[in-house]
Design a protein with these regions (language model features):
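A short acidic, Gly/Pro-enriched loop at the edge of an enzyme's catalytic core
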Residues: 93-105
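Core SAM-dependent methyltransferase catalytic element
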Residues: 179-194
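Class I SAM-dependent methyltransferase SAM/SAH-binding core
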Residues: 50-94
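A short SAM/SAH-binding and catalytic strip from SAM-dependent methyltransferases
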Residues: 104-116
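Short alpha-helix
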Residues: 159-174, 179
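A short glycine-rich, Lys/Arg-flanked "PGG" loop and its adjoining helix->strand segment in the class I
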Residues: 118-130
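Conserved class I S-adenosyl-L-methionine
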Residues: 1-46, 60-61, 76-79, 135-158
Length: 194
């Protein structure tokens, strides 16, 4: 599956995520996760911080004019245009930004779709200013939802998700500190500081 060209899947995914009732039901049934946790995390973002949101999807996490929405998928960026006009189509492994550009980077529900999540975390850390925060959520292995994760991998929708401990290792290896991990169901929320 190539998220860059999967127009129908991208549109369907964004519709479900943006619909409160569908996202609540889907998150609970599929991942044993209360989507309200994600909405709370998004609501705590500082709208005055220069923030990179990647993959931004349809822009659900956009929180102000200093928010740069980035995604590999042109379909997702088109949908995010409803919330911001600061859009960048890019690959998460080679961000077109100078080192130490952003006060914060957020990556909600995207790392598990990647083949090299550790490399993505390292690249996000590169563009963070000293003292900046990286936060997000990702599906993780090591729960009773592993068979479903494997099925999504076989369909090419997911890349190589790790466990919560793998996530800690990736964040630490990228040079991040003050790491906080909050596993709930098959989702782990995380925050770390550069």
């Amino acid at each position: 599956m190539n998220w860059k060209t999967a127009t129908a899947l991208s549109t369907l995914y964004d519709y479900a995520v943006q619909n409160r009732a569908l996202s609540r039901l889907g998150a609970r049934i599929l991942w044993n996760y209360d989507i309200a946790n994600l909405h709370r995390a998004i609501s705590t973002q500082d709208p005055t911080a220069l923030t990179l949101d990647i993959p931004c999807g349809g822009g659900m996490a956009v929180r102000g004019p200093r928010h740069v929405a980035a995604d590999l998928s042109a379909t997702m960026l088109h949908r995010a245009l409803r919330k911001t006009n600061t859009l960048v189509q890019t690959n998460i492994y080679a961000l077109p930004f100078h080192p130490a550009t952003f006060d914060a980077c957020v990556t909600y529900n995207g790392l598990h779709c990647l083949d090299a999540p550790a490399a993505a975390i390292a690249e996000l850390t590169r563009v963070l200013r000293p003292g900046g925060t990286l936060s997000g959520t990702t599906l993780v292995r090591g729960t009773n939802r592993d068979p479903l994760i494997t099925a999504f991998q076989r369909l090419g929708i997911f890349g190589t998700p790790g466990t919560t401990e793998d996530l800690r290792t990736w964040l630490t290896a990228a040079g991040l500190r003050d790491i906080e991990l909050t596993p709930t169901g098959a989702v782990t929320a995380f925050t770390a500081r550069k």
